[in-house]
Design a protein with these regions (language model features):
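Metal-associated gating/positioning segment near the N- to mid-region
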Residues: 1-30
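Short, ordered loop/turn segments at secondary-structure junctions
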Residues: 8-10, 40, 64, 91, ...
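Short helix-capping segments at alpha-helix termini
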Residues: 28-33, 144
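Active-site beta->alpha loop and helix N-cap motifs at the rims of alpha/beta catalytic domains
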Residues: 37-46
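Histidine/acidic residue-rich metal-binding segments in metalloenzymes
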Residues: 49-194
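Short, conserved beta-strand edge motifs with alternating hydrophobic and charged residues
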Residues: 193-197, 203
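Gly/Ser/Thr-rich active-site loops/lids in small-molecule metabolic enzymes
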Residues: 211-224
Length: 224
């Protein structure tokens, strides 16, 4: 692990100067590797007086609880006014279904086209970074100039291997063909970053009837 970045959807949520500064202070006193703290993208962000001056490592845009019009509109706004990375969770809000899950495959079926449809609409920009690529089709459709990353679980795990609903992650686990395509792209340097997408949920949370999405990626990177 060469760098750790704090996503704004952790506790406390990061969308203001004070929370950002508090997290930087804690990380400065404890981190033994490079670190970065991100700020959530939300309406009005680019109009805040500190937008151009706050020393955030990156901006982060999520597709949850937002219309597709607002999601892509915010991406364009930020990219037009920043020289810091805009990190996106690249799933199209219109292609993310919330149907109840009875098994792990349901979660994948609910989002079959979400990543490719999202990335094909994103504008080309060297400041756009696509977090946790999960589909080979999404990789092929990502905009020119954009950077990207992939996680071990999207390189090595798939629905043929994992059946338990406690393997639920966002974006979902995909197919063996997606594993193979992404692994080849990673091996050839077309995807330059291996990321953990660390989500430190407890065993009890993951074994519940409604497990949260995510894997403890820092612990599982080496075993995988």
């Amino acid at each position: 692990v060469t760098a750790v970045v704090d996503m704004p959807n952790t506790n406390p949520f990061t969308s203001d100067q004070k929370t950002f500064a508090d997290k930087v202070k804690i990380a400065t006193s404890k981190s033994v590797v490079d670190f970065g703290v991100g700020i959530n993208v939300e309406p009005g962000l680019v109009d805040r007086p500190w937008f151009d001056t706050i020393p955030s490592a990156f901006w982060k845009l999520y597709p949850y609880g937002i219309t597709s019009e607002d999601y892509f509109g915010l991406a364009e706004q930020v990219l037009s006014k920043t020289k810091k990375p805009l990190v996106i969770h690249g799933e199209h809000p219109d292609f993310m279904d919330d149907k109840p899950l009875t098994n792990l495959a349901d979660h994948t079926d609910n989002r079959l086209k979400a990543e490719p449809e999202c990335l094909s609409r994103m504008p080309p920009s060297p400041y756009l970074h696509i977090a946790h690529l999960s589909t080979f089709e999404g990789f092929k459709r990502k905009p020119s100039l954009a950077t990207s990353e992939v996680c071990p679980h999207h390189l090595l795990l798939n629905l043929d291997i994992c059946h338990s609903i406690n393997c639920k992650v966002d974006p979902p686990l995909r197919t063996k063909l997606d594993n193979q395509g992404l692994y080849k792209a990673f091996k050839e340097g077309q995807i330059p970053i291996l990321a953990s997408d660390h989500a430190p949920h407890t065993v009890d949370e993951k074994e519940s009837s409604t497990p949260p999405s995510g894997m403890p990626g820092v612990e599982t990177m080496v075993p995988l």
